[in-house]
Amino acid sequence: MKEKKNESSLSKAIILLVLSIVIIIIGLKFVKASTSITLLVGGAITSAVAVLWGTKWDEIEKTLFDNVRLMGIGIFITMAIGLIVGSWILSGTIPTIIYYGMQMIAPSAFLFIACLLCSIMSLATGTSWGTIGTLGIALIGVSQGLGIPMQYTAGAIIVGAMFGDKLSPLSDTTIMAPAMSGTDIISHIKHMLYTTIPGYIISLGLYLVIGSRFSGSVSSETSTLILKTLGEHFNLNPLTLLPPIIVIALIVKKMPSIPVYAVGVLAGCVFALIFQGATLSQMAAALGSGFASDTGVEIVDTMLSRGGLNGTMSTVSIMLCAAVFGAPLKASGVLHTLVNALERSTKSWKTIMASSYIANTIFLLITTSYYVCFTVIGPIFQPIYERYGIPKKNLSRMLEDTSTALCWVIPWGMSGIYASGVFGVSVMDYALYAPMTWLGVVFAFIYIATGRFVGKIEPAKSEPEQTHA
């Protein structure tokens, strides 16, 4: 009787999971609905099915609020970025960066340099979101001035930002992954090099190849017009570069994110008053609706008409709807049911490792947050890895390869939503040009199949001893 109940639970878990995926595909690809509406409808339908199958609504509601709470910092950072962009354009900070950046960086080298710069900053600060929200924003303007399509720029910046987020000992994910897996941070970082460095090198090579196509992308007339227009409409004082320098310095000192961005917004407003003669009404407009450029030069107006709190609301709505989408799947225990079934059906350490990658990816699709994945998947698989004699540094690497990295290429994932909002392009547009985000998983499966770079596999209870380099 118990076996039949387990089989019934497994079939229901599979049906709920497949149903949610089908809704996403139909909504986004065929109905062409917005991401928010698709997630909201998906959450409503799967909630109804879960309740009919015995999940209590109170549990779904509690899970929903837990999801929103976990997303809280991401929501506020997204809103803060809108305020920063509006104030930094009004202050002349971003126009100044564009002005000097266009003269100092060749279009052919821009993507390569942008990736390296973001790598350095993220390694030093340990934050990918902070890197994108400061240095990334500045590089966006430069890329537009150089005529480089935004999907390429987004890919290069994300790869650079994520590189440090995965490997910096200051990164919260680098600290959390080994803590949730039962290993130490040094072993974790060293082990991640095997899946991170190859993807990073391939990404840099891709940016050199793509960059070679843009050696003459901006005509001298267009470049001159952009520089001339910026010089006529803004006071391009080098001192206007202080706001991002202040923010970066505070991030390096590991100050809390929200106060740091508040200082950045305040600095932008003060510099707008001092250097651009902005009025309080202009500040309020830039912070609320975004900076509205009216130079009469279309390419410049397109570059600078950005930011503002209102412009972040669509991104915030996607985050909230993602919480709705994941709540019934998490509350109904879909993941635990699938993991238990996987463990019962396998006898191989290779299958266990591969299953952990698949399970964590599924859970990331459900919850949209790598923080949730770390705190749930790590403890679930830690005893399983121990039983099969698998070094737990493989578990921590798995959490980073899937959660930290793949979250950038999931349209409703927290990182993907954030990046899409900052860059103004969809996740599907830039995913191909951020290969390090998904190549880590590819290399991980190669290592699992070949037994390379997984450490020494101790004998499981039912298996003979195996050793792998």
Label each residue range with its predicted role.
Residues S8, M180-T196, Y200, A327, ...:
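C-terminal transmembrane helix pair
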Residues T38-T46, D66, L70, G74, ...:
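Alpha-helical transmembrane segments of multi-pass membrane proteins, especially transporters
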Residues P107-Y194, P198, N360-D401:
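Hydrophobic transmembrane alpha-helices that form the pore/transport pathway of multi-pass ion
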Residues V18-V22, I26, A44, A48, ...:
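Generic alpha-helical transmembrane segments of integral inner-membrane proteins
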Residues T55-Q144, G296-P383:
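Membrane-embedded alpha-helical segments and adjacent helix-loop junctions characteristic
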Residues M176-I186, I210-I246, F271-G296, M303, ...:
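Transmembrane alpha-helical segments and their short flanking loops
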Residues I157, M162-L170, G199-G216, Y447, ...:
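Transmembrane-helix bundle segments that line or gate the permeation/cavity pathway
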Residues K2-A80, I89-A109, G231-H233, I245-C321, ...:
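Hydrophobic transmembrane alpha-helices of multi-pass solute/ion transporters
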